[in-house]
UniProtKB/Swiss-Prot annotation:
It is a peripheral membrane protein. This is Retbindin. Belongs to the folate receptor family. It comes from the Eukaryota. The lineage of its organism: Eukaryota, Metazoa, Chordata, Craniata, Vertebrata. It comes from Ictidomys tridecemlineatus. InterPro entries: Folate_rcpt, Folate_rcpt-like. One of its GO terms (cellular component) is interphotoreceptor matrix. GO terms for molecular function: riboflavin binding; riboflavin transmembrane transporter activity; signaling receptor activity. Disulfide bonds join C104-C174, C111-C151, C144-C188, C157-C170. Not N-glycosylated.
């Protein structure tokens, strides 16, 4: 059963699980440095056309960041869980407390950005639960499919990111999303379980991440040359048409 919004003893456990999911997304996915205070002005906005709740706001520049500990300025720091796929890591231990060593592979910018947006969505959902707001919407199927497509070639912690025993279920070697999950729905249900249920296909009231917020890959040299050649061809065609018209006009004159 999905977590309800009213803060009662049982719901408090759901709220804490949701906070853990928010933390694990950074630990397994590679996102921005976690801090106790909110950064940026991101929130949830309702799409009146589809009744879907989407992440909205200004996103600060993002890029691969080192894995740091969660730290509250008013409390002692505590480290995040161990990094994913430790068996393939051949790196010395870090000197600072609570700092993650590198993982198997640096995450792609697209996957890292997507997980950063998803973390913010979880944070907003967490706040709604604490405020006693009505039950937050489930994840849109489109969000799960976009997550899978964006991170398909990236490394994942395993099929389950939330463990009752507190231990990871990493296999002997690092595996990609594509090797681990069948599709986006399988990804969401396996990774986040009942904490963030997936809405039925075509549902109009669910949590989605607008693709327009994600960074688009810059076109390569070949793509830029192709676009430039097409532009020149279009421009030449227009000039030729104009020139022939001008020539026809001059020829018909006295």
């Amino acid at each position: 059963m999905a977590c309800r919004s009213h803060i009662q003893p049982s719901d408090l456990a759901c709220t804490m699980q949701l906070a853990l999911a928010w933390i694990i997304l950074g630990a397994c996915g590679g996102s921005h440095q976690f801090q106790a205070r909110s950064q940026g002005h991101l929130g949830l906005a309702s799409n009146l056309g589809t009744n879907q709740v989407q992440l909205a706001g200004d996103l600060q520049a993002s890029g691969p960041q080192p894995y740091m500990m969660i730290q509250d300025p008013d409390s002692q720091a505590f480290p995040l869980p161990e990094p994913c796929c430790p068996s393939e890591m051949d790196t010395p231990e870090t000197s600072g407390p609570g700092i993650f060593p590198p993982r198997c592979r640096t995450p792609s910018s697209g996957c890292e950005s997507f997980l950063g947006h998803l973390q913010r969505a979880l944070r907003n959902r967490f706040h709604l639960l604490l405020l006693g707001v009505r039950q937050a919407p489930p994840l849109c199927e489109e969000l799960c499919q976009n997550w899978f497509a964006t991170c398909e070639a990236d490394i994942t912690c395993g099929r389950t990111w939330l463990w009752p025993s507190g231990k990871r279920s990493c296999e002997g070697r690092c595996r990609t999303y594509g090797q681990t999950f069948a599709d986006g729905v399988d990804l969401c249900r396996s990774v986040l379980g009942h904490i963030l249920p997936v809405a039925a296909p075509g549902s109009r009231h669910c949590l989605n991440i607008s693709i327009s917020l994600l960074p688009r890959p810059r076109p390569g040299r070949w793509a830029r040359e192709t676009i430039s050649q097409r532009s020149r061809r279009r421009g030449t065609g227009i000039l030729d048409a104009g020139g022939s018209g001008s020539g026809s006009g001059s020829g018909s004159g006295p």
